[in-house]
Amino acid sequence: MKVIFMGSSEFSVPTLEFLIGSQHEVLAVYTKAPKPAGRGHLLTKTPVHAYADAHNVPVRSPASLSSDSERDIIEKYMPDAIIVASYGMILPRWMLEVPRFGCINVHPSLLPRWRGAAPMQHAILSGDAVTGVTIMQLNERLDAGDIFLQESTPIGSRENIVALSERLSSMGGRMLLKVLDNLDTMRSVSQDDAGATYAAKPSEFCVNFNDAADYICRQVRAFYPRMFFFLDGKRVKLLEADNYELAGAQIGDVVNDELHIQCGNGTVLAPKIVQPESKKPCDIRSFLRGFRGCVSNVLQR
């Protein structure tokens, strides 16, 4: 089968790797354009772009897929299917109709639960015990197409988004090949829209100590390594934490000499791994040995 692959993030790479190593032919790879990154603001290719280059697969990075010229290019490829995995761009309606088998998406959730841009993060944040991968047909609605294949896996009690993404991306690549190898005879099933939930992309990563500590711990795992708080006027990233029940102190107060912090609902947050501004991650005891500020209250913005 001849396919076009569309993806951008690290999650996309294993799917492309499975495709390149299979009997199927990858005609071209579509990915987001290089962007400035790092302290030097050097133009940096997406992980998918770099992997495709290393395997001599043609790469395109259009700013939009809606132009007539891009449509001509895709139609000339005459793909049997277009494979999408964490691409980050919306496909126009005409593209869904170009391939013989349409556009097939690798989605990291058990659809219809967690449609949208951040399904893995929301599975962790909501305390889901199980998640998985869905191989589905794309249609004009957000992650609402028919399902070809779905597999589940438990979420580890301390598993963060990095570890979960690595596992699900590998699952997705393997599952996709199973679908492509049997696409002529495989039947799809429609989703139950009544069970749909939506995973919006997060935008706020500052710890709110009014929340319960167990919820904050799930935030830390779901949005790793982005969650942070302010201590003595300086930003500190929170990379790993535990929680327990204890009431009595004011919310935001430090309750012992290990920087355990009173949170909402009679809970306490116990930071384990933190990262001060412009420094490397360290365990909480190492951090406190080198800290010279005031730690009586962390509710500083």
From Swiss-Prot:
UniProt GO MF annotations: methionyl-tRNA formyltransferase activity
Keyword line: Protein biosynthesis, Transferase
A single GO cellular-component term on record: cytosol
Domain of life the protein comes from: Bacteria
Pfam families in the record: Formyl_trans_C, Formyl_trans_N
Binding-site residues, (6S)-5,6,7,8-tetrahydrofolate: S109, L110, L111, P112
InterPro entries the record matches: Fmt, Formyl_trans_C, Formyl_trans_C_sf, Formyl_transf_N, Formyl_transf_N_sf, Formyl_transferase-like_C_sf, Met-tRNA-FMT_C, Met-tRNA-FMT_N
Catalytic reactions of this protein: L-methionyl-tRNA(fMet) + (6R)-10-formyltetrahydrofolate = N-formyl-L-methionyl-tRNA(fMet) + (6S)-5,6,7,8-tetrahydrofolate + H(+)
Coiled coil: none
CDD domains linked to this entry: FMT_core_Met-tRNA-FMT_N (cd08646), Met_tRNA_FMT_C (cd08704)
EC number from the UniProt entry: 2.1.2.9
Purpose: Attaches a formyl group to the free amino group of methionyl-tRNA(fMet). The formyl group appears to play a dual role in the initiator identity of N-formylmethionyl-tRNA by promoting its recognition by IF2 and preventing the misappropriation of this tRNA by the elongation apparatus.
Protein name listed in UniProt: Methionyl-tRNA formyltransferase
